[in-house]
Amino acid sequence: MLFRSVTIGETTFGGREELVDSTGIMDYGSLIYVALQRSRTAKEAIQVMTDLVKEYGYYSSGESFSIADPNEVWILEMIGKGPGVKGAVWVAVRIPDDCIAAHANQSRIHQFNMNDKDNCLYSPDVISFAREKGYFDGMNKDFSFSAAYNPLDFGGVRFCEARVWSFYNMFNKSVGDTYLPYIQGDSKEPMPLYIKPSRKLSVRDVQAAMRDHYEGTPLDITNDPGAGPFKTPYRLSPLSFKVGDQEYFNERPISTQQTAFTFVSQMRANLPDAIGGVLWFGTDDANMTVFAPVYCCSDRIPDCYSGKEADCVTFSWDSAFWIYNWVADMIRPRYSLMIDDMRAVQNNLEDTYANAQAGIESSAMSLYEKDPVKAKEFLTNYSCMTAESAIDSWKKLGEFLIVKYNDGAVKKMAKDGTILRPETGHCAPLVRPGDRKSTRLNSSHSTSSRMPSSA
């Protein structure tokens, strides 16, 4: 998101490998950055991105972009034309105002209305090119971008589409029930690009959805043997593995430890862009981070996000990335023991930011009416302050977790939330999670499943 409140996210679907053009200039990251700089609306961003690949060539593999402004949300899907062939084939569909959509490393646009110019855009050769390459030979009305350029395989359904299903299932159980057979491989009817949720979603709803591990569904990974005695919803890479000659797999949930950063973008047409555009941003895994507000008018970033003192091989106590990873790596192996301690701090911070939002924006609006520059400075300072305060709280959380759970035993807590210390000054008797009386391995069912045979 930049200062005009246009937001672009992306997910790589790869698609047909023979369509990658290594001579192209514009990769998907460059398309995003340039479009954000040049666009005032989502539709303008689509025009900028497609014009750029037409003129300079497209370097990346298949991409799905979510492009939004305060009034519209679009999904744009794009793939190249092969080595040395400039340009790309693409289609973009507008998401209706009363609907939600999701994408997760698999192309999601199937049939589209070629006559609805207000809600559907596409390259002139999106179908003819597929015919030329032998990917499609039916009627135009039956053409599916996804089927032609990113045919589904087992991984596409179970590792990618399943995450979309879980998102839909959270907000419309009827849709979830309808498409569970598709996710489990018992139906070939694909999910729609978008659905109507059973209620209006809030920012907090979307933040919670980003933390999902299929909890409470048939794909729940907290109850199989891989979850261990502390029901961790995390599995080490790779997703599939072999035992003897048999191949198995673990589920791939929305929230995963391989995440570098996550965000929920909020755009509102009833406010000036400087105030209405908020990027709720966190580093590392969505489940283990704090979504702190960064207003789109900010002219500097918090020091903890800057990377001045850290990189991927250099730890720093001033780096948000490393502090969130430090705490998360403590929690994952002892998840059920420690997650509530983390969640209490996380909820307190995010509730504080959410409850303060109306007041902060009211103050910013008063400033904006008199001096927009001062309003932007005010929101920049607030954005930096919230990010840094979250890191300070997370450092204290990490210190607390080390003490409370040191050496595999759990110290008892006083009613005020501090670690219980008897009058003698020594530690109170410990709770030992390894004792069968307090912890049992629950392996009632397994989602570490056999891969289907290739036959």
Question: Which residues fall in each region the model found?
Answer:
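Short, small-residue-biased leader/transition segments that mark boundaries at the very start
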Residues: 1-2, 441-444, 451
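N-terminal short leaders/motifs
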Residues: 20-27, 216-221, 453
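C-terminus-biased signal that marks the final domain/tail of proteins
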Residues: 46, 70-73, 88, 97-440
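Short, solvent-exposed loop/turn segments at secondary-structure junctions
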Residues: 14, 270, 446
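Structured, non-membrane catalytic/scaffold regions adjacent to prosthetic-group chemistry
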Residues: 6, 10-11, 15-95, 100-102, ...
